[in-house]
């Protein structure tokens, strides 16, 4: 039996990864992390979506220690979430230091326990918002370290790594789940479900990608199929 663990936040990217994983694996587990994030509604949404889409199991882990250590606008109500700024440079204050290091490590331990061969994460270098822990070289390096550390060949899969946001929308549509992703996920940094607040960087990226896909869906779908090896 092919088994995978999806790092699952209930947002656009991880939900799209879950949708795809359910087509390729017999047994799919979701793991969600409660780190005291300001948009805590994502935990309930992740529960709802994992049940709705048919995941085998959904594990929510309390990692509140990350909140104590990592200062970010996503972990501190006192730090305002910035509006989208096309000219912004450097790492944004929405970056949570160490988050993906911790999440992928804990997901690997869980995968070890349930006998999963893969850990799937929705990180993306094409539209990575300046987050260093969304880069391909980081994921591959951590994967190598994990394999050495637990002596188990657990594979990190990053199906969105080289897709832009329009192609990520196309992937959801390919599996006939575009409306599920659009209306039932939470990507917004301000914790607003669906199309979100429309002002933060996450909402801008998501809306811009959807508009690009809707404006030329045939071309975007063709590009997706070529990149992802889909028919």
UniProtKB/Swiss-Prot annotation:
Q: Which GO terms describe its molecular function?
A: ATP binding; ligase activity, forming carbon-nitrogen bonds; zinc ion binding
**Cofactor annotation:** Zn(2+)
What are the leading ranks of the lineage? Bacteria, Pseudomonadati, Pseudomonadota, Gammaproteobacteria, Enterobacterales
Reactions catalysed, as given in the entry:
7-carboxy-7-deazaguanine + NH4(+) + ATP = 7-cyano-7-deazaguanine + ADP + phosphate + H2O + H(+)
Report the protein name in the record.
Answer: 7-cyano-7-deazaguanine synthase
Q: Name one Pfam family in it.
A: QueC
Name of the encoding gene: queC
What is a biological process (GO) this protein takes part in?
queuosine biosynthetic process
Q: Which domain of life is it from?
A: Bacteria
- Amino-acid positions noted as binding ATP in the UniProt annotation, renumbered to this chain: 8-18
Q: List the disulfide bonds.
A: none
Pathway the protein acts in = Purine metabolism; 7-cyano-7-deazaguanine biosynthesis
């Amino acid at each position: 039996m092919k088994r995978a663990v999806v790092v699952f936040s209930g947002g656009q990217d991880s939900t799209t990864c879950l949708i795809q994983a359910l087509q390729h694996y017999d047994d799919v587990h979701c793991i969600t992390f409660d780190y005291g994030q300001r948009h805590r509604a994502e935990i309930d949404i992740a529960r709802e979506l994992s049940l709705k889409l048919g995941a085998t199991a959904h594990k929510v882990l309390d990692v509140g220690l990350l909140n104590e250590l990592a200062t970010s606008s996503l972990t501190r109500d006192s730090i305002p979430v910035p509006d989208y700024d096309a000219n912004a440079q450097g790492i944004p204050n929405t970056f949570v230091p160490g988050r993906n290091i911790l999440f992928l490590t804990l997901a690997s331990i869980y995968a070890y326990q349930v006998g999963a061969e893969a850990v799937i994460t929705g990180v993306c270098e094409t539209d990575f918002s300046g987050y260093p822990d969304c880069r391909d070289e980081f994921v591959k390096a951590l994967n190598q370290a994990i394999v050495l550390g637990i002596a188990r060949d657990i594979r990190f899969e990053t199906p969105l790594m080289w897709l832009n946001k329009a192609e990520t929308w196309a992937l959801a549509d390919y599996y006939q789940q575009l409306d599920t992703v659009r209306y039932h996920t939470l990507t917004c940094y301000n914790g607003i479900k669906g199309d979100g607040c429309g002002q933060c960087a996450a909402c801008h990226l998501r809306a811009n990608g959807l508009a690009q896909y809707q404006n030329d869906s045939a071309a975007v779908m063709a590009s997706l199929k070529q990149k992802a090896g889909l028919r």
